[in-house]
Amino acid sequence: MSIIIGIDHGYYAIKTAHCSFPAGLTSYGEHEPYTRQGLLEFGGCFFVCGSGRQPIQRDKTINDNYYLLTLAAIAKEIQQRGLPPECSVRIAAGLPLTSFGRDKPKFREYLLRSNQPVNFKFEGVEYSITIEEVAIFPQGYAALMTETGLLQDEPSMLLMDLGGWTVDLMRIDNAIPAADTAHSLELGMIRCVDDIREQVRRETGLSLTDAQIENMLAGQPCTVSDTVREIVNKQGRKYTEHLLSATMEAGFDLHAIPAVLLGGGASVVSRHLSPKDGLCKTIFLLGDKVNAVGFERALAAVSRRKSEV
């Protein structure tokens, strides 16, 4: 029996139902590195997964980076579930609606390769994984599988998926995606974090790490001065205002229809919204794994329907 593993291949992080790690990848060639944490051995080469951030790839299939990160994600999820390292897997992944039809065949082929099973070692454990199927679903909309009641409560709503590089927008009418309204803004969390880092450097001369900025944006502990914290919070509010303005300019009236916000940036916006923004209604699906969970539920639902035919 095969297992379903949902994977959200973000620009900023790779997420499964139980794991999340940065989408960075460092190649060490044939030389084993100093660490076993995140260490992937594949094809006679060594890679450390989750180390920092890699350059933005608009086409994730141009090299093997996201395939290697997929293997790491499978290994991490299998370990979390307590499953054997030799098993069959069905991958449920996603793409933005703005590029869904164009990129779906290529991304599916990229993840589903002919050489099966896939043999690799991750953090010292040998894996033999047979990838039986790869199913691709629309990002954001699939995440609503985790909160199906939302689709029944409102005739129209705006879905805002705040990812690492882009914020994907789409209106949903009577529980059906209005595909012609799909729009993508390059205002994801990478942009937010980079702008904050630059502003802190400009005002204080300090160079913050991504992790420090992320913690402060989430309201978590971080040893910095009150001045730095104030700059970060001010920039978080500025980012939120910019995002709301860009969304309105894209043709979505946030004063008239409810908005469902999800993805890694949703928690930032939730902490920096103000009553003076005058939004109709905001619903937050917090947690960076909702897309991955939604992909899994979507594939499970498709499988059930097929078995009933």
Descriptions of predicted regions:
Residues 1-157, 176-191, 203, 210-309:
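Nucleotide/phosphate-binding catalytic cleft detector across ATP-hydrolyzing
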Residues 16, 169-171:
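Conserved blade-register residue in beta-propeller folds
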Residues 162-168:
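Ser/Thr-glycine-rich phosphate-binding loops at phosphate-binding pockets of nucleotides
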